[in-house]
Amino acid sequence: MSLITSTFVIAVHDEILKETGVGREGCHKDKLEGVLSRIDQQMYYNNVEDLFEIAAWYGIAIAKGHAFVDGNKRTGLATMLTFLEIQ
């Protein structure tokens, strides 16, 4: 199970679009689930335990995963920073 859920990431994305007024809505939820699974695999199978490394995985994987129509990099950055903030 992901430390950060797809529902949370979608909420972050929607808030970014609302606040900035820039970008188009739309999410490929299956792609997003795959992105989050990739992070889980790194944590559990490659023993990634460092919080900063996990945060980096969130930022990079969400940005490169292109689960959203617009705002992937912004969402990746915001999710990464939020993850660090709540830890």
Annotate the PLM regions.
Residues 1-87:
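FIC/Doc superfamily catalytic core
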